Swiss-Prot record:
It comes from Vitis vinifera (Grape). Its EC number is 3.6.1.66. This is Inosine triphosphate pyrophosphatase. Homodimer. GO terms for biological process: deoxyribonucleoside triphosphate catabolic process; nucleoside triphosphate catabolic process; nucleotide metabolic process. The lineage of its organism: Eukaryota, Viridiplantae, Streptophyta, Embryophyta, Tracheophyta.
Length: 206
């Protein structure tokens, strides 16, 4: 592990966590949700595009990132799962979105009455290159709708969470960040850090 040692109270000391992302919007949300609870830096890494279940993909990315960073890392994998399609596009939503766009994603469900879906977020944390990653899942149910709202963050315009009349894209940021799949997963991350008693050096985040 990349832990530097232990304090008198037995707390683990380490470098700040490196959150691996090249997505500015995602980074903005993570900073908003975590606040000052977990000091972290951000870094874009070229990690291989993996296939499999969301939790397995997230864990393997954390292992690979921890080796490159040689320290504690947090990685995220996000899915949009259509119930009528048995969970697809799932972890491949990024590529579906790039190829067919919001309209194409709606068209995938044209022949189905069931427009229900869920947003799934898998965060994996590895304390270092020799540590087994721990994974935290957040899930928000909703439905797929024709795109509404700003078109500047992935599939947000076509996902309307249950109990709301707005899509993710239409919601105020502070509202979305209280109910999103990302918020739910990060709440578990924060709880894990608090219970584990990690104490990290507080370098200024970048």
């Amino acid at each position: 592990m990349a832990a530097a040692g232990a304090s008198a109270s037995g707390l683990i000391l380490s470098r700040p966590v490196t959150f691996v992302t090249g997505n500015a919007k995602k980074l903005e949300e993570v900073r908003y949700i975590l606040g000052q609870s977990i000091p972290f830096n951000s870094l874009k890494l070229d990690l291989p595009e993996l296939q499999g279940e969301p939790e397995d993909i997230s864990k393997e990315k954390a292992r690979l990132a921890a080796i490159q960073v040689n320290g504690p890392v947090l990685v995220e994998d996000t899915c949009l799962c259509f119930n009528a399609l048995k969970g697809l596009p799932g972890p491949y939503i990024k590529w579906f979105l790039q190829k067919i766009g919001h309209e194409g994603l709606n068209n995938l469900l044209m022949a189905y009455e069931d427009k229900s879906a869920y947003a799934l977020c898998a965060f994996s944390f590895a304390l270092g290159p020799d540590a087994e990653p721990v994974t935290f899942l957040g899930k928000t149910p909703g439905k797929i709708v024709p795109p509404r709202g700003p078109n500047d963050f992935g599939w947000d315009p076509i996902f309307q969470p249950d109990g709301y009349e707005q899509t993710y894209a239409e919601m105020p940021k502070e509202e979305k960040n209280k109910i999103s799949h990302r918020y739910k997963a990060l709440a578990l991350v924060k709880s894990h850090f608090a219970k584990a008693g990690y104490v990290f050096q507080t370098d200024s985040p970048i």
